[in-house]
Design a protein with these regions (language model features):
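C-terminal domain-tail junction helix/linker
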Residues: 211-215, 237-307
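Short, amphipathic alpha-helical "recognition" segments used to contact nucleic acids or chromatin
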Residues: 1-10, 46-54
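Mobile-element integrase/transposase regions
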Residues: 78-149, 173-178, 182-183, 188-190, ...
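A short acidic/small-residue loop/turn micro-motif
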Residues: 152-153, 163-170
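Basic, flexible linker segments flanking DNA-binding modules
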Residues: 17, 24-127, 224, 280-289
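Residue-level signal for the short linker/turn that defines the boundary of a DNA-recognition helix
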Residues: 10-12, 59, 79, 249
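Mobile genetic element proteins and their domesticated derivatives, centered on retroelements
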Residues: 16-17, 27, 49, 64, ...
Length: 307
């Protein structure tokens, strides 16, 4: 069992309690016979979960469990997932679901050239092989603004983003330039940029930026969101886990919040489609990524590729 249980180690208690802002006296306040460790650590787990829920109000219970487990597992007193979720429930820390109105962000009725889909049924095996792009809306006290994201299809890392008050091409272009700033020309020449057929991505300035760096261009062939599923999923996570739960007063504040949210998304939030790793970790790897979920049509014993 844990060092806390076996030896009541002062150094271990001091480290653990100090890490979460508690004194050893506070720890011992929660003693209950032989189960003092579990009972004492429970409020620490709840408090840490409360901290994460405050900053990340839509983070799913399973994701939050993985994060908290990584912090407390070494104590030997971390509850199982079901017990952890029950802790969240009794402490009012479950996700609150809100529905929002939707805004159109894609206009495919334009005169620009539309490119073919180069990534259909392609499973990336390295970072910077395929980037996927999309635009979504953000409601603020000043009105709606728009978030442009570029996500790596292999690692699911958001590599470029921008917030703007309109759907002008300049904001997706800003996100693209941020992303291109993270790679060299050789890497860019082996990269495919995939998007919908919206006028921003088909515009002369956006296409010119891609061609300047030798990036191959791929686009969806219809309005089916499955043709750009990873980009749609990244947008959905950002909206449902954060933006729908927040009241953002200004567009300027939105930019500040997005910087914080994307940092957490990339470096702390585990993703089931990459083996419950963070995108930052997966971005340093190559080869098949094991996903931690099955499609309804997958056989129970079938090894699943990344999704």
């Amino acid at each position: 069992m844990s060092l806390l249980r076996e030896e009541d180690s002062p150094s271990s208690l001091r480290t653990l309690c100090g890490l979460f802002g508690y004194s050893r006296q506070s720890f011992y306040t929660h003693k209950d016979g032989n189960d003092f460790a579990e009972n004492a650590i429970e409020p620490l787990i709840v408090e840490k979960a409360r901290d994460y829920r405050r900053d990340n109000p839509g983070l799913g219970c399973a994701k939050l469990y993985i994060i908290i487990k990584n912090l407390f597992e070494s104590t030997g007193c971390m509850p199982g997932r079901d017990a952890f979720i029950e802790l969240l429930r009794v402490n009012g820390l479950m996700v609150q679901i809100k529905r929002r109105r939707h805004y159109k962000t894609t206009d495919s009725s334009h005169h620009y050239h539309k490119y073919e889909n180069l990534v259909k049924e392609v499973v990336p095996m390295r970072p910077n092989e395929i980037w996927v792009s999309d635009i979504t809306y953000v409601e603020t006290g000043e009105g709606v603004c728009y978030l442009s994201l570029i996500t790596d299809a292999y690692s699911h890392k958001i590599v470029g983003w921008a917030v703007g008050p309109t759907l002008e091409t300049r904001y997706p272009l800003e996100a693209l330039r941020m992303a291109l700033g993270t790679i060299d020309d050789e890497t860019a020449s082996r990269l495919i940029h995939h998007s919908d057929r919206g006028c921003q991505y088909c515009s002369a300035s956006y296409v010119a930026e891609l061609k300047k760096h030798g990036v191959m261009i791929s686009m969806t062939q219809s309005g089916d969101p499955l043709e750009n599923a990873i980009a749609e999923r990244a947008n959905g996570i950002i909206k449902t886990e954060w933006l729908y739960k927040m009241k953002i007063p200004t567009i300027g504040k939105c930019k500040e919040e997005m910087e914080r949210i994307i940092l957490f998304y990339n470096t702390e939030r585990p993703h089931m489609s990459i083996g419950n790793k963070t995108p930052e970790v997966a971005h340093g790897e190559q080869g098949e990524q094991k996903r931690c979920w099955r499609n309804p049509w997958d056989k129970p014993t079938e090894a699943v590729a990344s999704g």
